[in-house]
């Protein structure tokens, strides 16, 4: 992020990835810790905040070998905001806290993915309770971000085939046979919707932070 840029002035900047900031359970999230960080940058008159890609990582935790150029890593989801905005039931807060406390003494990619999956399941539990306005915003977002359907289908297929490389998948999926893909989408509506919901919330939270910084 570059704040109030003027080419005739000197600027200072800092490189810090959001995952390195405090907050969240397994790494920094798009929550209050980032807002606090932006406030500190402003107080110190640091104009530029540079960070590494926010995309989902590979099995080794690298964002440079990501399954998507557009998607955001689910690890960054801010649960507190989801609860506050009624996207997750308040009653689930204790459940999330218990899971975090039990599993997150040290950082593990597998555990981080498991908790992201749990958050996705909780979002699905509350989906039918969302207002028409919120569902409409989600649908409009999906229409304006056509990549998210292909990404969601791809990720459900990747899980089906034990996260193997796509070129090792059955022929009908490897070459994106239209009828095979349509059948897959029809039979996997909920898993695909869950991934879309996660990406929508990530994008929504990130844009709020960007606006706050600007």
Protein language model annotation of sequence segments:
Residues 2-214:
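Acidic/aromatic-lined carbohydrate-recognition and catalytic surfaces
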């Amino acid at each position: 992020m570059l704040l109030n840029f003027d080419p005739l002035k000197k600027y200072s900047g800092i490189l810090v990835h959001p995952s390195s900031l405090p907050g969240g359970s397994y790494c920094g999230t798009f929550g209050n810790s980032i807002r606090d960080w932006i406030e500190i940058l402003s107080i110190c008159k640091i104009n530029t905040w540079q960070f590494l890609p926010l995309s989902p990582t590979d099995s080794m935790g690298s964002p440079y070998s990501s399954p998507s150029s557009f998607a955001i890593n689910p690890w960054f989801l801010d649960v507190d905001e989801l609860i506050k905005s009624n996207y997750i039931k308040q009653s689930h807060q204790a459940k999330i806290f218990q899971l975090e406390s039990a599993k997150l003494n040290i950082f593990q990619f597998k555990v981080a993915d498991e908790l992201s999956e749990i958050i996705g399941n909780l979002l699905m539990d509350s989906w039918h309770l969302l207002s028409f306005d919120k569902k409409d915003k989600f649908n409009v977002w999906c229409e304006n971000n056509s990549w998210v359907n292909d990404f969601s289908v791809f990720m459900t297929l990747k899980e089906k085939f034990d996260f193997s490389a796509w070129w090792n998948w059955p022929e009908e999926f490897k070459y994106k046979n239209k009828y095979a893909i349509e059948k897959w989408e029809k039979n996997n509506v909920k898993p695909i919707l869950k991934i879309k919901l996660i990406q929508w919330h990530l994008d929504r939270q990130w844009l709020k932070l960007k606006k706050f910084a600007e």
